[in-house]
């Protein structure tokens, strides 16, 4: 819940001097990316901008405090301010900020700018007190914001110092409007106006000018002088002389003498007590100070000129001038030290009553009241956890004594989930073990079951499926039906374990159950996770179309619940890329992989390993070895500079081994084969992939017998576990083994099996990457004209893809080839005496490559009738009557030239 006063522009007071000269300068603010107002405290920055903002509608205001260094809090308020300015235009971004469903501030801002692209009128965003931001991540994100914000948006920043926002670059590019302390300082005329509206007896212009000069036009000093003069303690000039040369850091003594010592004791205590509140309203004041009518008291303090300002148009929320507020808080620690804990407790209770638990925690921590802090956490901690208030929770839990955690195991569980969310798996188990050792009877009942559900999640994340299964089963046996969150966790873990074991049907059922429970209870990240797992399982079973449809459901869930910035989104777009690649939709596959990298842009580069491998796979399918090599250099650098799960390493190794196969790099393959992991089993699609990598390397090295043993065992496992996609891949690799070993009939047998199975999987690119060896076999099968219709159609499609991406020059009879052919001593006399034109040679090459007449016309960009003429001419010159004879003739020519076909 956001505090309204932080999003309210200060009310323009009646007795303030209108800064016409500065307002004139600000009138052109819409021509700049950034308007920067900087000065020490008390120069009137906020007052000036509130005057400028008066009457503007498309403006959002965000007043910072120290707590806004939390990235999530900063994001929530900033987006809320934009929503305020645009009347709710950025709904997607607002939901993402509220639910903390974004990877980073920069990715959230990128989404914001997408939505603002449809907002065409001028827009202003004011951020007050930016000097309070010390978080470098926020600074970097705001630099990104300024670089990419729409042209019609102006950011207005108020700060006591020069913020780290790339100011120099903006200044050089004339995109910065600056107002500093020298310009903010009051002129003689403004000082005269100020005193005239503050003092009952006007002072001479010369007098006010001298006072203005004495304090260098410092607005706070002028206000203090007016206050002293009204209280008749000193003449205005005496006060001015005393303040001359004093800056904001040396005001304490003056404020004690001239303000606190000149109010009655009740007002003094009111000021000191209320100052602990960063913002205040009637209810807070009544509870903290004991005053019966808080609103009336606040308005009275405001009338006395005691540096209190309204924060919103309703007049409900107030705050002290930062300079005066800091002074009062310091004095409160001196004068009311004994009462201070009780004052903070009262503030915490009042904030809780108004529904602001995070503000209440701030005061409970300040009070050092562990019991109050415990009670707040017991009631609100999980809500804060689900809203990613992780740093606040961590600070709060550290402030509680261990005994308090033991008395409330829910808080131990919360601390453990906090650790798990930060990938501190070892610490989770240590904490839970310690708690179980020290809490009586914890090893039985619901809490123990919740511990086990969390332990199961940690175990599966840490690569221990057997332990995860044991713990998940224990949790599900002990958890009551109403403990939905832990039941969702345990069910999901059990489904993932079965996935790892290759028990795909049972795993799919559990993941569907997880999805149903997660949707019912709005646990959206587990709903998304279950859909991703379902898609992977269906892919492994060979049901790629159903996997596609499941992915569509996942994308719909992401859009509906605004989960775009979750790291899991990368997982989804990556498996979508894998599916598109299998179907030879390479451009779309590459785009998906790149969008996955974009989702992870704010994470460590190592997290992008799998998407990078997918990009390399696309390059390999296109036969673009130069690009693949460039990307492989980066992939191998990442592999050498990170620790990865075995599945990730297997995927990375796949593209490396395929590249070595395509470039005949036997040395690299042999070196890799000596050092790579050889899994004990091959009972899931992850392990099958690694063993396939090994078999491919063995085939490249001519170790056919070893590779055949591996592939036959893989096929046996794949058939028994119904890993149909893996079986399809294995058959293709076995085909290459038989082809290279000269076992042509075996090669044809398994290729026919692979083509038949591809009717179910839809595989195209898995055939294509095998290159010319695959093309030669498919040409022969097509020439035999014995394939069933579906397999015939697929074979022709695969052949077209190979010809498009893996063209060898002899398939196209280029000029150099034809010249060497005509000079060959064994060339048929008919060709020598009646040579084909260059275009006819091209057509012959395409016929040999399996192209139809229409496809040849498309390839050469000529009319189909023209192609028919070329074919008729080349048939006549070659002395053949039909297409198959032309293919056989081309094959003879290629063999004569030394090509193994």
UniProtKB/Swiss-Prot annotation:
The lineage of its organism: Bacteria, Pseudomonadati, Pseudomonadota, Gammaproteobacteria, Enterobacterales. The keyword Magnesium does not apply. GO terms for molecular function: ATP binding; DNA binding; DNA-binding transcription factor activity. The keyword Amino-acid biosynthesis does not apply. The gene is malT. Monomer in solution. Oligomerizes to an active state in the presence of the positive effectors ATP and maltotriose. Residues 829-894 form the HTH luxR-type domain. It comes from Escherichia coli O81 (strain ED1a). ATP binds at residues 39-46. InterPro entries: P-loop_NTPase, Sig_transdc_resp-reg_C-effctor, TPR-like_helical_dom_sf, TPR_MalT, Tscrpt_reg_HTH_MalT, Tscrpt_reg_LuxR_C, WH-like_DNA-bd_sf. Keywords: Activator, ATP-binding, Carbohydrate metabolism, DNA-binding, Nucleotide-binding, Transcription, Transcription regulation. It holds the Pfam family TPR_MalT. HAMAP family: HTH_type_MalT. Activated by ATP and maltotriose, which are both required for DNA binding. GO terms for biological process: positive regulation of carbohydrate metabolic process; positive regulation of DNA-templated transcription. It comes from the Bacteria. Positively regulates the transcription of the maltose regulon whose gene products are responsible for uptake and catabolism of malto-oligosaccharides. Specifically binds to the promoter region of its target genes, recognizing a short DNA motif called the MalT box. Residues 853-872 bind DNA. This is HTH-type transcriptional regulator MalT. Belongs to the MalT family. SUPFAM superfamilies: C-terminal effector domain of the bipartite response regulators (SSF46894), P-loop containing nucleoside triphosphate hydrolases (SSF52540), TPR-like (SSF48452). NCBIfam families: PRK04841.1 (NF003420).
